[in-house]
Amino acid sequence: RALYVSLHHSAPALAQAAAERALGHKSLFFCQSRSLTELVAQRMSGLHTEVFVHHSSVSTEERHAAEERFHRGQNVCIVCTSTLELGIDVGDLDQVFQANAPSSVSSFLQRMGRTGRRAGQTANTTFFCETADAVLQAISIIELAREKWVESVPQKTRCWPVMVHQLLALTLQFGAISAERCWSQLHRVPDFSGIREAEFLALVAHLKAQDFLFESGGLLSMGQKAERVFGRKNFLELYAVFTSPQLYRVETAGGQTVGSLEQGFVDRLVEEMSSFLLGGRAWKVDKISHSDRVLHVSAAPRGQKPSWGGFVPQLLSFPLCQRMRRVLAEETVYPYLDDASQRALADRRADLGPLLARGGLAIQLDDTAARLWTFAGGCINHTLKYALEWTTGWRVIADNLQLRIEGDGVQHQRVEAALGTIAALGFWDDSGTQRALLARLPEYRLSKFQQALPEAMALEMVGEYLLDIEGARGWLTAAAARSI
C-alpha cells in the first residue's frame, strides 16, 4: 500500500497540493460534503488537470458525462462524495485522494480499493488534511486497517420509519388490507423483530388518527394525508425510502440541467447579483422561477460554495476514537506523514500526552469551562452530555473526543462527582432517566416517514442514532476503575 498524509491549513492550499499531485494521472478525490467538493473542484480548475464533480446534487446527465470523459482521459480528476465509493465503474484509476479523513475504516478501504487493480499497480491513498485532528483521524484509520480491524454492521430490530413505509406500501399494493395481515407479513422481518404486536397496533392507531391510514370494514387503506404527502408523481415518494428535500433545478439558457440546489440556499440568492458553484463551475443567477422550481443561470467568473441542509453530526466509533487516544499517548513515528503533519502530531502530543499518561479522568480546566477528554466517540459522548445536563444543569458541548462542560462551580472534583452520580447502579436502567434523555434530543430529521410517527417512536429513532447507553455505562465503569 502507498499511503501519504499531508497537512494544509486551508481548502485552497489543499486543492493546490492535490492539483499538483494529480497532474498526468487519473484520480478520484473524495470529500466528506458536497460543499467542500464544489470548493475543491473550483480551486483545482485551471491548474492543468481536467476536473469534474460528482455528487448527488449534480444532474444525472452531468455525472454520466463526467464518468465517460474520465474513462477516456489521462490527466483527469473527479472530485466526489461517497457517490463514487461503490458500484460505479470509472475504469482504470491511478490515484485516490481524500480531503481530511473519512468517518470509518470501511469507507477508507472501499475508496483505496478503487486503485491497485492493474498488474504492477499499488493500491494507494493520499490524505489532504486541513487540521491536526484530521491528521490524527487519518493515522488512526490507517493503523486500524493495518491491524485488519473494520466496523461491524449493527443489526437494527426496531426500524420505525421503515415500518411506516411498509404499511403504506402494503395499502398501495393491495388497495385495502387488514392490520392482522400486515402484522403477519412484517413481524418476521429481522428489522422489525424487536417490535411487539401491541406496539405495532399502537402505531396503526396513531396513523389512523393522523389520517395517514383509513379503516373501513376492518381493512386499512391509504389516508388522505398520506396521499397528500407521499402521493405526488404516482406515489414516487413511496418507491424511494430516502428523503429528498425541496429542490430547485439549475438550468442554463440552452436548457442544460446542471444539477439541483435546496430551497434554503436558493432563498438567499438575488437575481442578476448572486453567483454560486455547482458541478465545479461558477454560475450567475439570471432568474428564479419559484412556480416550477427552476433556477435559470449563466456562466460566471466566480461564485460562493452552496450549502445543503439536513445537518446531522458525524459520529465516529468508540474503537476509532480510542485508537486516536493511543496515537497521542504513544511515541510511534509514522513514515507516511509529511513534515507539517509530523509537527501537528507532535504539538497535539505535547498538549494532551502528559494528561493522558497520568491515568484517571483526563480533565483540563480554564476560567470558564472544563474539558473532559473521553475519546469515546460521538454516541457515548452525546449520551454523557444529556445525562450530565439533566443531573447538574450544566451546559455540555459534545464531539467525538471530548465534553466541554460550562456552568457554575465546574471544577475537577465536581465533574468527578457528577460522573459518579450517573455511574451509580440503576441510574441507566431507570425509566425516568431514559425518558429525560429522549426529551432532550434535538429534532434531527432522519427519515421522510418520521413525521408520521408518534412522538415517542420518533424520539426513540433519533435516540438510537445519537445515543449509546450501554457504551456510556461501560465507559463510566472503566473510568471509575482507572481513577482508583
Regions found by a protein language model. Name each.
Residues 149-271, 275-282, 287-288, 364-375, ...:
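C-terminal accessory/connector segments of nucleic-acid motor ATPases
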Residues 6, 249-252, 298:
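Short, acidic/hydrophobic/Gly-rich beta-strand patch recurrent on exposed beta strands
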Residues 55-56, 153-157, 220-221, 293-298, 394-415, 429-434:
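A generic structural motif
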Residues 2-3, 147, 159, 233, ...:
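Terminal, basic amphipathic appendages of nucleotide-handling enzymes
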Residues 1-174, 178-225:
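Helicase motor core with emphasis on the C-terminal RecA-like subdomain
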Residues 342-410:
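C-terminal accessory regions
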Residues 13-21, 70-81, 197-200, 206, ...:
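Phosphate-interacting basic helix/loop segments used at nucleotide- and nucleic-acid interfaces
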